[in-house]
């Protein structure tokens, strides 16, 4: 008896991202390595506050195959308070400058701070990764004034309160509608849509059930005609599924990353770069075969 034909896999609506004069080709998914310049991030807070330590870790992630390095100076873990603007700038810019001078990979700045957005381009950044999707005052104007790529993420509430019993009537419908609205807002501000990617915001104002519902139907977000970014690494909902502490969630994180790529994700944000690169390469190969 002949084997049944494989079910077609989702195809993301865009396979490239414009980032400050460079083009990120996304025919296959790539890995974005995480570099937190914070004292209180849930997984690696305090490890890379020294610029030399941050650069060494950036070099290691580049060697392991990261295509993008995401540098952040404000913790957005559940319950985190907002960072002081000037403090965030002082943490991030020296590291961006050092990395830009030493490494050829794309540099993302994880921020909602419009002043940091403006200054990051001059420091050598290529991409803004904003958990607030340019909703902060003056953020969309700051982004429109430059030419950096922009990742628009969905978050219900703020980090300080986002996990206090988040509720949705239909989480997939609401997340998709929010991201569509933010893409339209960027277009209205004069931002080229080819500079945009979108992120459904796993773990940001969502219960484990919400996260699983989004993952089951991720292909419906991947049809927004912009590249899809996902952040799944070491998240608390991995702990809810596995019972593992933050430093022991690699296997669960890799399983989710693989599923995400098969369902249309093009950028996978990760702390454990080497292992995630391997998982993404396997998932990319599976996508090619099944198409």
Go through each PLM region and give its residues:
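Active-site-adjacent loop and "lid" segments of alpha/beta metabolic enzymes
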Residues: 3-4, 8-11, 19-20, 26, ...
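Hydrophobic "anchor" residues on beta-strands that sit immediately upstream
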Residues: 32, 66, 106, 126, ...
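Catalytic domains of carbohydrate-active enzymes, especially glycoside hydrolases
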Residues: 56-72
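Phosphate/pyrophosphate-binding loops at sites that engage ATP/ADP/AMP, CoA/4′-phosphopantetheine
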Residues: 62-63, 182-195
């Amino acid at each position: 008896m002949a084997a049944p034909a494989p079910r077609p896999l989702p195809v993301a609506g865009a396979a490239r991202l414009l980032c400050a004069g460079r083009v990120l080709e996304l025919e296959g998914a790539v890995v974005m390595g995480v570099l937190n310049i914070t004292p209180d991030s849930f997984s690696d807070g305090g490890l890379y506050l020294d610029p030399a330590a941050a650069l060494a870790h950036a070099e290691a992630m580049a060697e392991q195959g990261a295509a993008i390095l995401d540098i952040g100076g404000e913790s957005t873990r559940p319950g985190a308070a907002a960072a002081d603007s000037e403090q965030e700038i002082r943490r991030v810019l020296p590291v961006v400058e050092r990395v830009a001078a030493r490494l050829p990979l794309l540099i993302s700045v994880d921020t909602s701070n419009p002043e940091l957005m403006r200054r990051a381009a001059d420091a050598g950044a290529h991409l803004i990764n904003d958990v607030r999707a340019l909703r902060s005052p003056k953020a969309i104007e700051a982004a429109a004034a430059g030419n950096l790529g922009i990742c628009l993420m969905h978050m219900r509430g703020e980090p300080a309160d986002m996990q206090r019993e988040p509720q949705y009537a239909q989480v997939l419908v609401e997340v998709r509608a929010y991201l569509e609205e933010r893409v339209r807002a960027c277009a209205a501000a004069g931002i080229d849509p080819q500079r945009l990617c979108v992120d459904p915001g796993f773990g940001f104002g969502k219960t484990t059930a919400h996260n699983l519902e989004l993952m089951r139907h991720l292909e419906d977000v991947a049809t927004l005609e912009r590249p899809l970014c996902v952040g799944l690494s070491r998240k608390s909902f991995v702990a809810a599924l596995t019972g593992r502490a933050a430093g022991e969630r690699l296997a669960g994180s890799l399983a989710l990353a693989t599923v995400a790529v098969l369902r249309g994700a093009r950028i996978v944000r990760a702390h454990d770069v080497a292992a995630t690169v391997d998982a993404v390469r396997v998932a990319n190969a599976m996508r090619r075969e099944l198409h």
